[in-house]
Amino acid sequence: MSSILLLTSSPRAESLSTPIAADLAEKLKNQKPGSVVVRRDLAATPLPHIDDLFTGAIRKPAEARTAEEIAAVKTSDELVAELFAADTIVISTGLINFNIYSSLKTWIDNVARAGVTFKYTESGPVGLVTGKKVYVVLASGGVYSQGPAAPLNHAVPYLKSVLGFLGITDIETIYVEGLAFGPEAAEKAIGAAKSRVEEIALAA
């Protein structure tokens, strides 16, 4: 059975990244009978930010944690389990101030854990989350995949860096961009993204 982890992060009711990502996850599920989609709406149900109790707890062996510390890492443990169980991960975000939504960053902070999803060695860090395929649906008012504004796109390099640090290197970005350039440009961008979703699903 294939597991697809869908992470949506836009707080906007009229979000375009969310429905396109959800459509991709559903199409991938339909291509492989028996597949399941595990969805985390990070905007509708925000995750806890890491705090002093959490950072102290994850530095201890699980058996040495107090009841309060166990409770502090419970959500993180669940998120990590979902990540390891997933074969495919679909992430949606808008480009907000040149980066990802804070709700998605909080998910990353909860799953990036030394000794769990990556480890330090004498020869450098080693990612422990391997064999995953990631699709990132990124929506933006301007064009940031190429051209003069491309250096301002910190979202894709950041996601590739942090996911790569965890061991996930097979990452494709589906851009839904130029949405602020008028109805015709927006329609074209949405159509291109939907076409790519169809291509990915057919090739799955």
Curated annotation (Swiss-Prot):
HAMAP family: Azoreductase_type1 (MF_01216). One of its GO terms (molecular function) is electron transfer activity. Belongs to the azoreductase type 1 family. It is an enzyme of class 1 (oxidoreductase). Quinone reductase that provides resistance to thiol-specific stress caused by electrophilic quinones. Also exhibits azoreductase activity. Catalyzes the reductive cleavage of the azo bond in aromatic azo compounds to the corresponding amines. FMN binds at S10, S15, L16, S17. Binds 1 FMN per subunit. It catalyses: 2 a quinone + NADH + H(+) = 2 a 1,4-benzosemiquinone + NAD(+); N,N-dimethyl-1,4-phenylenediamine + anthranilate + 2 NAD(+) = 2-(4-dimethylaminophenyl)diazenylbenzoate + 2 NADH + 2 H(+). The gene is azoR1. Its EC number is 1.6.5.-, 1.7.1.17. This is FMN-dependent NADH:quinone oxidoreductase 1. The keyword Repeat does not apply. Pfam families: Flavodoxin_2 (PF02525).
